[in-house]
């Protein structure tokens, strides 16, 4: 399954919000050296109830708009 995600870094509290267009993920990490991407994968894995290894970024590794693949 592929999911469209908008990432909001530097959030005070990490959370995932489902919308009609996909997910908005507030990440409590800085977008430096992949820290925000790693935290994004952890949060999405927890949200969908799968292992972190089953979530990967298909498109948008360096931007705020991403496509995730959950297997």
Residue ranges and their predicted role:
Residues 1-34, 38-42, 50-52, 56-71:
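Contiguous, often N-terminal, cationic amphipathic patches that form binding interfaces
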Residues 45:
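The alpha-helix within a helix-turn-helix
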